[in-house]
A protein has these predicted regions:
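Conserved beta-strand-loop-alpha-helix hinge in the C-terminal portion
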Residues: 91-121
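Catalytic Walker B motif of ABC-type/P-loop ATPase nucleotide-binding domains
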Residues: 37-40
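Hydrophobic anchor residue at the start of the ABC signature
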Residues: 26
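Conserved H-loop
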Residues: 67-72
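Helical segment within the ABC ATPase nucleotide-binding domain
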Residues: 51-65
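Conserved signature/switch motifs of ABC ATPase nucleotide-binding domains
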Residues: 11-14, 32
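Conserved ABC ATPase "signature" region
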Residues: 1-8, 60
Length: 136
């Protein structure tokens, strides 16, 4: 119920869309009631509309459960939308380059000036990073 797929509980996996499969994966990760949820670029293969819906779902789940969620992403908007704390890593070797909190209310209003300020701040930090050396 938490991920909104109750009416598809008897469906076969091949009958589900990409977004539905991501919701099933999220439900499976939450089923054993972990203290923390680790997510490595969970939305990268989804279309924009499905991605936005899942952002809303994840925010709702986080607000209801209070679980710690560690999210790895290369998507600035995703970080601004979902994170309470952002940790930017340096290129190889990966080290913490910057860390800051995002103190915006939930659910996040992605049209607000404050949300856009957060995105601009993250982008400015990324642009100021030294370039990663090219592979030999």
């Amino acid at each position: 119920k938490l991920v909104g797929l109750e009416r598809f509980r008897h469906a076969h996996i091949h009958e589900l869309s990409g977004g539905m499969k991501q919701r099933v994966a999220l439900a499976r990760a939450l089923a054993p009631a972990p203290d923390a949820l680790l997510m490595d670029e969970p939305f990268s293969a989804l279309d924009a509309i499905t991605r936005e819906r899942l952002y809303d779902d994840l925010q709702r789940i986080h607000m209801q459960s209070g679980k710690t969620i560690l999210l790895v992403t290369h998507n600035v908007r995703e970080a601004a939308c979902l994170a309470d704390r952002v940790i930017l890593l340096s290129p190889r070797p990966g080290r913490i380059r910057e860390e800051f909190r995002i103190d915006l209310p939930r659910p996040r209003d992605i049209t607000s000036p404050h949300f856009n300020d957060v995105k601009r701040h993250i982008l400015s930090l990324l642009r100021s990073a030294p370039a990663e050396p090219a592979a030999a």
